[in-house]
């Protein structure tokens, strides 16, 4: 590649002139230096700019006079400019129109500061190749950063923009993937202008054959700021914004189509206009395609202090009764996201068909021929100015008092959903229809609440009124189980109903329909009658519940319930299980078979750690539990066959429920145990009694209910085995075992929230019978062991609970998680004995349906 470094203007001119008599060559120009570079008309296969241009005040970056480039024009250079009327890259037509056969691509950083300063200015240039279909050519692309600042406050005499395209012919796209920032009056981020220098000239001189796409960021600040503007452009394609366009200033417009027809304006990003009379998207005397999936489409955010989307077309007559150009209308489609405007969300100029398929509209809707609701749409609009509003499918959520100027239809299966709160005037219709309102059979008028205080007393509201009402079989009902709708009447061209806080019995069916489980329905019904009806309307609990949607209500209903997942009971059972496992392994090593015939009396200590995970079972949320404990014991031989012992254990268990609740349980157990052996037969048993101190914390709507209560546990364990010697070192012991445990929890009353519960006493029994195999070996000083057992619970007890709210009211019952029939256990251990000392470690694994637990034990023993 031929590199053109910093040359004089004359040298560049000579080089360009001589190229007319030689084959075009690729050119690379290093733009570094303090004065501008001028490139005369010439032929090039491509053009690349490199370096960093730190120019003197008033000096441009680089100017081209009608370059003829068969390939791409790529800027990899950086420009820092200051002074009046400067631009970084200029392509003019002083001697000839320019031509770029490929694309113009900016990868650099441009900083231009001064009155009427600009970034890139391309005029009277053909970019691309007519009739050639190639996405890589014909484009103007910004991948870099362009900053333009003009603090003079004086309107520019020439067009001012970060990227200015005047009278250009593009066979491709205009694409911004980078960052554009402009601070100036009457300036644009990207502007394509097809008007000649004579402002009265109505001929379009600019053409874009493909799309205008922004996936980057465009920010323009100043009076009459423009984000993207197409003025008198032969276009007919798409403007797509998947990035961010922000404009700020009086009269600012984020996206403006001025006498430039288009196929579609699609927003999936953010378009925001701040300032008096600002506009998000403006279509001025520019027609869009009105076919399905065309026109102006929003899937993102369009917000303006003035008007979100504005249509202006003085070329059409839109007065009352006007029928000329009846087919020339605009199509606006709201699929998702938000369209909002301080003056109006949408102004269709009487020429627009509006399709509302989803999302939210904030602000008045004006100038609409026909509006169709085809999905779930929320509107915060005082005015819907439309000849016809047709709710064909889904639900139209009306969040404030709204006037519909034309006729309105609510079709079969569709709904009109109205929000009420204390600011709603009961005597004034929430939706007032100036024309005829038709409610088809199967249509629904729903009532719900929006954030704000709502009185508990049943009050008569005017839901809908019309100049003429035709009810063909509409249903009026509540959309939240916490409200009751009664005394519905269709009279005097109005729909009225009494609305108030529902009683528990009234709310039951709605709670179930909202997906609240059986326990949640019981707890919520009691809460409504016993607590909610007594709360001030401005309390946290009241506001949280009354304004909850279905998903939030399901969560709140779970929070209201007492713990029904057996977590507290399981914590006490875990303490007995850990203790009995430790004592069982100790007792099994006492007899003659173990090779410890000389042992008469000894003391031992074991350190325990276990963790368990209970998954959801029977629709009841699970929990995780971590246990740590210490056991101290002593035992001795009563005779050659019998050994008796006593142990004291203390186990702490922290339970974290999947609902977010916590329970801490501290259990102290006293255990008597013994072992008997006669030949190959052995029997091991234990009896334990203990007490637990329980501290529970439940969380309801961000408030904590704390409980402090006691429980006691009784447990017994008995097993019998028959020893089969596999060899001189290893024994196999088939084993039968049974175990029983009962946990009794005292009644208690929570504190800390008005949703606190008074919970009755509870009990839970487990009776396991099972069998399995044990392996015990002696290899010198080492004694390995292993076991595999299976148990069946014949008690099948569940943790059912009877509770009432501490504020009073009737009790309600909740059903606990169902018991597990089968339990499977496996364990391994290893002891090492030297003289009178023994140390060892063991690991046990427990598996049930939706449950698993791990236990690790370290032990030490001294024999007297």
Which stretches of residues belong to each language-model region?
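Outer membrane beta-barrel translocator domains of Type V secretion systems
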Residues: 535-728, 831, 842-861
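Outer-membrane translocation/initiation segment of Type V secreted surface proteins
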Residues: 2-4, 8-10, 24-37, 450-630, ...
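Extracellular beta-strand/beta-solenoid scaffold signature
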Residues: 25-38, 54-66, 82-97, 113-133, ...
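Right-handed parallel beta-helix
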Residues: 45-53, 71-80, 101-111, 137-149, ...
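Outer membrane beta-barrel transmembrane domains
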Residues: 671-675, 726, 751, 758-864
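Extracellular beta-strand/loop-rich repeat segments of large surface/secreted proteins
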Residues: 369-460, 467
């Amino acid at each position: 590649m031929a590199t053109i470094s910093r040359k004089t203007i004359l040298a560049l001119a000579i080089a360009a002139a001589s190229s007319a008599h030689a084959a075009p060559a690729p050119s690379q120009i290093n733009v570094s230096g303090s004065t501008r570079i001028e490139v005369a008309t010439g032929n090039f296969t491509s053009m690349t700019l490199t370096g960093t241009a730190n120019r003197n005040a008033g000096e441009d970056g680089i100017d081209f006079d009608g370059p003829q480039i068969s390939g791409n024009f790529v800027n990899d250079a950086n420009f820092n400019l200051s002074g009046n009327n400067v631009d970084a890259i200029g392509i003019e037509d002083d001697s000839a129109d320019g031509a770029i056969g490929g694309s113009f691509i900016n990868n650099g950083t441009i900083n231009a500061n001064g009155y009427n300063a600009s970034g890139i200015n391309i005029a009277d240039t053909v970019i691309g190749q007519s009739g050639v279909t190639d996405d890589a050519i014909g484009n103007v692309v910004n991948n870099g950063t362009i900053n333009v600042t003009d603090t003079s406050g004086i309107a520019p005499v020439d067009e001012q923009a970060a990227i200015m395209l005047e009278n250009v012919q593009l066979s491709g796209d205009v694409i911004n993937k980078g960052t554009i920032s402009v601070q100036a009056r009457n300036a644009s981020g990207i502007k394509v202008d097809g008007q000649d220098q004579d402002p009265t000239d109505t001929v379009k001189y600019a053409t874009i054959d493909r799309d205008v796409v922004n996936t980057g960021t465009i920010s323009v600040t100043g009076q009459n700021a423009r984000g993207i503007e197409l003025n008198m452009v032969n276009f007919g394609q798409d403007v797509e914004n998947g990035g961010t366009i922000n404009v700020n200033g009086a009269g600012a417009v984020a996206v403006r189509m001025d006498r430039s027809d288009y196929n579609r304006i699609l927003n999936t990003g953010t378009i925001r206009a701040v300032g008096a009379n600002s506009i998000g998207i403006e279509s001025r005397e520019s027609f869009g395609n009105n076919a399905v999936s065309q026109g102006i489409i929003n899937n993102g955010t369009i917000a303006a202090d003035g008007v979100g989307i504005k249509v202006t077309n003085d070329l059409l007559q839109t007065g009352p009764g006007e029928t000329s150009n009846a087919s020339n209308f605009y199509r606006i489609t709201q699929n998702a996201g938000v369209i909002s405007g301080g003056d109006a969300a949408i102004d269709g100029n009487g020429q627009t068909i509006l399709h509302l398929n989803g999302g939210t509209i904030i602000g008045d809707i004006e100038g609409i021929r026909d509006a169709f609701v085809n999905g779930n749409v929320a509107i915060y609009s005082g005015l819907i100015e439309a000849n016809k509003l047709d709710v064909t499918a889904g639900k139209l959520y009306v969040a404030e008092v709204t006037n519909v100027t034309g006729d309105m239809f609510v079709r079969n299966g569709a709904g009109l959903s109205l929000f009420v709160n204390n600011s709603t005037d009961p005597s004034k219709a929430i939706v007032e229809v100036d024309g005829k309102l038709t409610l088809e059979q199967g249509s629904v008028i729903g009532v719900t609440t929006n954030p704000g205080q709502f009185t508990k007393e049943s009050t008569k509201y005017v839901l809908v009124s019309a100049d003429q009402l035709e009810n063909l079989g509409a249903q009026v009902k509540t959309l939240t189980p916490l409200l009751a709708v009664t005394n519905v009447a269709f009279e005097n061209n109005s729909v009225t109903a009494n609305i108030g806080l529902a009683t528990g019995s009234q709310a039951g069916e709605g709670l179930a329909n909202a997906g609240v489980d059986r326990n949640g329905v019981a707890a919520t019904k009691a809460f409504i009658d016993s607590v909610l009806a007594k709360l001030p309307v401005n309390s946290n609990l009241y506001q949280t519940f009354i304004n909850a949607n279905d998903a939030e209500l399901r969560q709140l209903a779970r929070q209201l319930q007492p713990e029904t997942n057996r977590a507290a009971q399981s914590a006490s059972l875990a303490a007995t299980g850990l203790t009995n496992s430790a004592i069982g392994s100790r007792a099994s090593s006492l007899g003659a078979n173990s090779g410890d015939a000389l042992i008469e009396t000894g003391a031992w200590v074991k350190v325990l750690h276990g963790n368990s995970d209970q998954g959801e079972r029977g629709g009841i949320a699970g929990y995780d539990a971590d246990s740590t404990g210490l056991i101290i014991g002593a035992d001795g031989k009563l005779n050659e066959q019998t050994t008796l012992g006593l142990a004291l254990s203390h186990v702490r268990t922290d339970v974290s429920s999947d609902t977010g609740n916590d329970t801490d349980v501290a259990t102290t157990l006293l255990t008597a145990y013994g072992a008997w052996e006669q030949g190959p037969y052995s029997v091991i048993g234990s009896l334990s009694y203990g007490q637990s101190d329980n501290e529970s914390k439940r969380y309801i709507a961000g408030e904590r209910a704390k409980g402090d209560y006691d429980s006691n546990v009784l447990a017994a364990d008995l097993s019998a085995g028959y020893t089969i010697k596999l060899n001189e070192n290893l024994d196999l012991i088939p084993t039968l075992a049974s175990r029983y445990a009962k946990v009794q929890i005292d009644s208690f009353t929570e504190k800390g929230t008005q949703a606190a519960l008074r919970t009755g006493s509870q009990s839970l029994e487990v009776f396991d019978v099972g069998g399995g195999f044990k392996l015990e070996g002696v290899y010198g000083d080492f004694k390995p062991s292993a076991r595999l057992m299976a148990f069946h619970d014949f008690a099948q007890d569940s943790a059912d609970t009877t509770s009432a709210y501490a504020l009073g009211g009737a009790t309600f019952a909740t059903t606990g998680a169902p018991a597990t029939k089968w339990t499977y256990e496996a364990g391994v251990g290893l002891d090492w004995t030297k003289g009178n000392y023994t140390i060892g470690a063991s690991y046990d694994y427990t598996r049930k349906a939706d449950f698993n637990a791990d236990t690790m034990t370290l032990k030490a023993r001294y024999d007297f």
